[in-house]
């Protein structure tokens, strides 16, 4: 009900009805009042005219009695005529009740003294009570000199007339006026409702459009063909709606691009408002915050507070869960609505860069050590031979053998470095052939039989001699040589090294398993990285360059396969090679 009363249509309709009703009431009151006044005045004028004629007739006549009788025939109500010579000496015995009351009014009302004393015409409304009802009469006193007396200058011609006819006429006019007003009001009501509905129809359309715009629907654009202010308003609103749609689309596009860029960033991004609440974050930041420890959280909060205080960009290093991050916090004047300031936090994972830098340092140290050792041996033994320190043929032969071994070792080291450089520049070429896997594993068995016996290792091969794989013999020889050499370094006498074949629906699988020292969990994710080397204190024998497993991974991936490692510290390590089956 209240919503209907709040409608513009109802308000406009009620306003028009109220105005028209007020005007009709005022006009009706004015008309009725005027008609009452008009008929009263007309009646008074008519009575006055009758009184004047009677006064003139009586004054000019010699026979007063005949003149009075004749005068009674001239007026509408002959019984309403009274000619009073002296109002103080009038007998009321033969008068009717009405005339008695009229005579009493003349005698007792001081206004009528002006008729006798000043010769003025006086009119008064007199209410007569008769038979339990009241009736209003108009009583007019008109001066005349028809009969002289010693008490006053003038006599008086008094005529009274019943106003019931005027009241009936006024009542009829009132009823007609009210009926006319009601009819006019009814017509006005219908017309006003139609007019207000028609006028407000464009406004209702604009309201519907505004509601849809507030809900994000900009497609609805009402057509208002009028040329008035409402039509102009509709055109302006349609134009505004179109511009809002364009701006919203632009903002939405910008937001989508921004969100896509932020979510695609490798850095974690956080938006912090003045209340220290996160109002913006990407996936990387969510992952970091899910795994953050209390110390790192306290570190981050301190840096955010420092940025709020200094309003300057802060950049600090953070180490958490064996990973390394660079945290950058920047102060922003307006980060959300209302002009509130905030801080944007950028967390960049620098673990790979840190590890790569560390690996480069280790690589330089290892390569320097690896190069220095054979070079020192080559120099020492050759100087011994050249200087004649070693003269016995057997000693010379032994020294030359050592020189040869160190030369081969130096050559192998240089070849590994050259292979990596060549693979980076030209890529790795693999010539796969469908051939028995036994050909490769038999070769490995012969190659490492003596080494296993010398090291006290139990090396076993378990494979199906008839099974054929698709692989490059030389490249896979390089892979297995590296893996078995690594297994030999991380084992002790009595440990086992097992090479086993298996398969699934789409892949051939090769396991190289040892029961050696194993690899710590923090190293597992990096063993295939370039230049990476596990703790040298747990290895036995000569050290490599940290390129072997990196080269193995490149070879296996070039075959279209994968290589993985599983290890448990103190229990051993298993390398798993998967190659696609021959088509």
UniProtKB/Swiss-Prot annotation:
Deleted gene: phenotype: Inactivation significantly enhances staphylococcal nitric oxide susceptibility.
Residue ranges constituting the Histidine kinase domain according to the UniProt record: 366-583
Chief location category: membrane
HAMP domain segment(s): 197-249
Annotated TM spans: 12-32, 175-195
GO BP: osmosensory signaling via phosphorelay pathway
Family annotation (InterPro entries): HAMP_dom, HATPase_C_sf, His_kinase_dom, HisK_dim/P_dom, HisK_dim/P_sf, HisK_sensor, Light-responsive_reg, Sig_transdc_His_kin-like_C
Record key words, sorted: ATP-binding, Cell membrane, Kinase, Membrane, Nucleotide-binding, Phosphoprotein, Transferase, Transmembrane, Transmembrane helix, Two-component regulatory system
Induction and repression of expression: Up-regulated during anaerobic growth.
Membrane-related topology note: Multi-pass membrane protein
Documented EC number(s): 2.7.13.3
GO CC terms: plasma membrane
Cytoplasmic side: 1-11, 196-583
Gene Ontology terms, MF aspect: ATP binding; phosphorelay response regulator activity; phosphorelay sensor kinase activity; protein kinase activator activity
Intervals, Extracellular compartment: 33-174
Enzyme class name: transferase
Pfam families associated with the record: HAMP (PF00672), HATPase_c (PF02518), HisK_sensor (PF18698), HisKA (PF00512)
Record carries keyword Transmembrane helix: yes
Subcellular location: Cell membrane
Catalytic activity: ATP + protein L-histidine = ADP + protein N-phospho-L-histidine
Superkingdom per UniProt: Bacteria
Record-listed Phosphohistidine modification sites: 369
Role: Member of the two-component regulatory system SrrA/SrrB, which is involved in the global regulation of staphylococcal virulence factors in response to environmental oxygen levels as well as biofilm formation. Also plays an essential role in host-derived nitric oxide resistance by regulating hmp/flavohemoglobin, an enzyme that detoxifies nitric oxide by converting it to nitrate. Functions as a sensor protein kinase which is autophosphorylated at a histidine residue and transfers its phosphate group to SrrA.
PANTHER family: HISTIDINE PROTEIN KINASE SAES, TWO-COMPONENT HISTIDINE KINASE
This protein's name: Sensor protein SrrB
Lineage of the organism: Bacteria, Bacillati, Bacillota, Bacilli, Bacillales
Gene name linked to the record: srrB
